[in-house]
Design a protein with these regions (language model features):
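Alpha-helical transmembrane spans
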Residues: 1-61, 157-213
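Structural detector for short beta-strands of small beta-barrel domains
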Residues: 62-82
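Well-ordered beta-strand positions in beta-sheet-rich domains
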Residues: 69-71, 97, 113
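OB-fold (S1/OB) nucleic-acid-binding surfaces
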Residues: 80-101
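A membrane-cytosol interface segment of integral membrane proteins
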Residues: 104-155
Length: 213
């Protein structure tokens, strides 16, 4: 089974596009200060998405220095509202944790020999795409192991993933209130700031490699 970027990266890129669409939708109604804020948000989303994409495709180093065949397994991190997939990689007496974008093959991955090239991570024909830099210490929170026996990969729809990634957006109204207070805006400014903040929080969860499992 081959895993291309279409499967692992489609969801975060769709959320990125949706976030930029929300930002663009408020441009016609923005005054000069609001327009400047929207421009900053839009540029930040584009820049950070490009950086994460660079990590995923090996353009930027993730800090994973081992090469060749190494022992690895998948663990799922659960910390507060954060859920991410990590590859726990053993190389000699050293262990590191590499975050990766979720794809269904991760849910059934049993301890195996991973092939590292310095720019990519493979399990046979399946490629895993890094969603951040490697850690040399165990990720914070609860780490859940995969089942010891492989099963059919689960299917998680976009709706489920959006619902999970929307959880951090509960703080968006506070951003809206702060914007109204600082900029002396009205109801329209509050609604605009709240929706942009909610979209941005959702995007940040997705682009950091959220795990719907």
């Amino acid at each position: 089974m081959s895993s291309g970027p279409a499967r692992a990266l489609t969801y975060p890129l769709l959320v990125t596009s949706g976030t930029l669409a929300v930002v663009a939708a408020w441009v016609p109604f923005a005054d000069i200060d609001q327009l400047s804020a929207l421009a900053v948000v839009g540029l930040a989303v584009l820049a950070y998405t490009a950086y994460r994409g660079g990590l995923a495709f090996g353009v930027f180093p993730t800090g994973l220095v081992a090469t060749g065949a190494v022992r690895g397994r998948r663990v799922r991190q659960q910390y507060r509202l954060v859920s991410r997939s990590w590859l726990e990689i053993s190389s000699g007496d050293r262990m590191v944790w590499q975050p990766v974008f979720y794809e269904p093959a991760l849910s059934t991955l049993t301890p195996t020999d991973l092939e590292l090239t310095g720019r990519s991570i493979h399990d046979g024909n399946t490629r895993f795409y890094p969603s951040g830099r490697v850690r040399t210490t165990e990720p914070t929170g609860k780490l859940v192991d995969n089942p010891s026996r492989p099963a059919d990969p689960p299917a998680f729809g976009i709706a489920r993933r959006l619902i999970l990634d929307l959880q951090p957006a509960v703080g968006a109204p506070l951003v809206g209130l702060l914007w109204v207070y600082v900029m002396n805006g009205g109801l329209g400014a509050f609604i605009g700031a709240t929706t942009v903040a909610a979209a941005t929080f959702t995007w940040l969860s997705a682009i950091r490699g959220s795990d719907p499992s």
